[in-house]
A protein has these predicted regions:
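Short aromatic-glycine-(Arg/Gly/Cys) micro-motifs in beta-strand/loop hairpins
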Residues: 8-23
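Short, flexible micro-motifs
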Residues: 18, 33, 58
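Short N-terminal helix-initiation segments at or just after the protein's N-terminus
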Residues: 22, 38-41
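A short, exposed loop/beta-hairpin motif centered on an aromatic-Gly-Thr core
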Residues: 24-34, 95
């Protein structure tokens, strides 16, 4: 699922840029505009995954956003599937059935069966 929301960027008097996503009530910042955009995308990913996991609906993106003088409004997107894949490092235990001779050969060769299985699944799924 992809989310696209307007983000308000304003210069911070202390330096850098502030980013505010009004539809998700997110505030973040960056040292420059590029980093502020990246941080807004990251924050949207975190909040979006939490909402998705909790079964909460996503608000519709605002069509009109009031922007303070000197501010910039820009649409920022985040792909929640890609974000989750890139940031979720949790592993799960899964039992696999193998012929005993294949298991013995893998052990004898010192192979990491879990790593090989992960690589094969990623290749099969094109991820």
């Amino acid at each position: 699922m992809k989310l696209v929301y307007p983000v308000i960027f304003t210069e911070d008097p202390a330096g850098g840029y502030m980013a505010y996503v009004p539809d998700l009530e997110i505030n973040t910042q960056g040292e420059d505009l590029a980093e502020a955009i990246s941080m807004a995308r990251d924050a949207m990913g975190l909040v979006g995954i939490d909402m998705e996991d909790d079964g909460k609906p996503f608000p519709a993106p605002s069509q009109h956003v009031d922007c303070p003088t000197g501010g910039i409004v820009s649409l920022v997107d985040v792909d929640l599937v890609a974000y989750r894949r890139a940031n979720e490092k949790r592993t799960v235990r899964r039992n696999v059935t193998l012929p005993s001779w294949l298991n013995a050969a893998a052990n004898e060769a010192g192979l990491n069966v879990s790593a090989i299985l992960q690589a094969a699944l990623k290749q099969q799924l094109n991820v």
